[in-house]
A protein has these predicted regions:
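Conserved short alpha-helical segments that host acidic/polar catalytic motifs at enzyme active sites
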Residues: 1-222, 227-286, 292, 380, ...
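Secondary-structure transition/capping motifs at alpha-helix termini
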Residues: 128, 149-150, 283-287, 305-312, ...
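A conserved beta-strand->alpha-helix junction
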Residues: 132, 137-140, 311-322, 419-437
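Flexible loop/turn segments at secondary-structure boundaries
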Residues: 84-85, 115, 187-188, 209-210, ...
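A structural signal for isolated positions on well-ordered beta-strands in alpha/beta enzyme cores
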Residues: 40, 354, 382-384
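PRPP-dependent phosphoribosyltransferase catalytic core
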Residues: 161, 176, 213-215, 219, ...
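Short, glycine/charge-rich flexible loops or terminal/linker lids adjacent to PRPP-binding catalytic cores
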Residues: 308-353, 363-364, 391-397, 401
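Extended, hydrophobic alpha-helical segments in both membrane/secreted and soluble proteins
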Residues: 289, 296-303, 307, 311, ...
Length: 477
């Protein structure tokens, strides 16, 4: 009950005219957990782009009347947004559409650029006019500028990859091609699948492939540029291996859906392993193990399995409200917690409870959940967290924007436990983090401060928009 992720991207390429908008709709539905601020779909009907985007959930933005207005087409690009740069307004919703000298471009982006301000300044000095505060528009403009001299859109994208720093998983389309790109570190997931009729699907997670009936083909490699067109699939691996692979390990702990498989690792299995490790490193004398829905459930199963303590359903989630961390602003977050979870009193009353959750960022949500269980009659509450303490901001597409918001930066574990009101508190040990996925090829900078890339001084999630506002006001950033 903690941190939030960035966005979900989805793309469709078909050799024939079909209802690609509906495929994009169902794909976004499966990626809704990655972003709930807004969403958008752009359909390519023989080079004519038709798009719609709005603030809200997929079901709210794409009503039946809206979906009927989409033409049939051969391609579509779609996006579910949570803003890691730029404010929560319609202009910052994606996909971004750009008309340029040599054609059109529709772009959806998952991640966060660490050099967005520098690139934007260079573009503005050369005459670019921006309409959003999103770094996705910056990427789109870099591509279109490179396309002026590049022999093809693929070449323009390749040149753009050389200029981008940070995390970016992209799905874009020109008039004739669908292109998927994953940054050289592979911070964010991206994969593709194939339907029985030959239609190709690109998505942030494999769960979205299954939702539309596509068979998973493979993950897109870190640094790979994959192009789909009338001649088939073309893979450009010239950027592969130029940087160490650093997939965000928090995808497995919290962001991704448990039924997804990312880079060959089951998200569900990784979470269960986290719970098993917690049971060994932080045992507790208890009567029941419960998980905080949703991402704490799998880890709770692992804890119960390893400890031998019965697993139970102690908290029920209101499925019609989004993740607490996804709502922008602390006031919204507190309001949502009050209606999001309800305790199952018969399961917890008079019992010593082990409550497993994925993380504690600010402590706001955790304290409220603990109080819910106390009010329901829990005798003891032993909280176990399936990740190490958050000690450092993330600059690669999540909403851990500054150290001042991280409770673990200001308090010891014992103090945090006292603040949130538990009888004991235990985190997944940092040295056991790699055991979740059986590899060292992961980014864990939010836990250990070991950033894979250079980070601009004082960079924050909201710095991009703050500096843009200062420029407009004539201030020196």
């Amino acid at each position: 009950m903690s941190i939030h992720e960035e966005c979900g991207v989805f793309g469709v390429y078909s050799q024939r005219q079909e209802d690609v908008a509906s495929l994009a709709y169902y794909g976004l539905y499966s990626l809704q957990h990655r972003g709930q601020e807004g969403c958008g779909i752009v359909v390519n009907d023989d080079g004519v782009f038709d798009g719609h985007k709005g603030l809200g959930l997929v079901s709210e933005v794409f009503t039946g009347s809206v979906m009927k207005q989409f033409p049939r087409g051969k391609m579509a690009v779609a996006h579910a947004r949570y803003g890691t740069t730029g404010g929560s307004n319609l202009a910052n919703c994606q996909p971004i559409q750009v008309n340029h000298l040599k054609g059109k471009l529709a772009l959806a982006h998952n991640g966060n650029l660490s050099n967005a301000l520098q690139l934007r300044r260079e573009l503005e000095l050369s005459g670019a006019i921006f309409h959003t505060t999103s770094d996705t528009e910056t990427i789109a403009y870099v591509i279109t500028r490179e396309r002026i001299t590049a022999p093809s859109i693929q070449a323009a994208v390749s040149r753009t990859v050389d200029r981008l720093e940070g995390a970016f998983s992209l799905v874009m389309m020109s008039s004739t091609k669908l292109i998927a790109v994953r940054d050289p570190h592979g911070f964010r997931p991206l994969c593709y699948g194939k339907m029985k009729d030959g239609t190709y699907i690109v998505a942030s997670e494999s769960c979205a492939l299954h939702a539309v009936g596509a068979e998973f083909q493979r993950d897109i490699l870190p640094g790979e540029i994959l192009t789909f067109d009338c001649d088939g699939i073309h893979s450009d691996t010239s950027h592969c291996g130029t940087a160490p692979k650093k997939m965000c390990i928090f995808e497995y702990i919290y962001f991704a859906r448990p039924d997804s498989v990312i880079d060959g690792v089951s998200v569900h299995d990784a979470r269960v392993r986290a719970g098993e490790i917690l049971a060994k490193t932080h045992p507790a004398d208890a009567d029941i193990v419960i998980g905080v829905p949703d991402s704490g459930l799998d880890a709770a199963m692992g804890y119960a399995r390893e400890s031998g303590i019965p697993y139970g359903i102690g908290l029920i989630k209101n499925k019609y409200i989004g993740r607490t961390f996804i709502a922008p602003g602390q006031d919204h977050r507190v309001d949502q917690v009050k209606i999001k979870l309800s305790p199952v009193e018969s399961e917890v009353r008079g019992k010593r409870v082990v409550m497993v959750d994925d993380s504690i960022v600010r402590g706001t949500t955790s304290g409220r959940i603990v109080q819910l269980l106390r009010d329901a009659g829990a005798k003891e509450i032993h909280m176990r967290i399936s990740a190490p303490p958050f000690l450092h901001p993330c600059y690669y597409g999540t909403d851990i924007d500054s150290r001042e918001h991280l409770i673990a930066c200001r308090h010891t574990v014992a103090e945090i436990g006292e603040i949130i009101g538990v009888d004991s508190l235990g985190y997944l040990p940092l040295e056991n983090l790699r055991d979740l996925c059986g590899s060292e090829e992961y980014c864990s900078a939010c836990f250990d401060g070991d950033y894979p890339t250079s980070i601009p001084e004082d960079t924050r999630k909201d710095q991009f928009e703050q500096k843009l506002s200062q420029r407009k006001a004539g201030e020196k950033p």
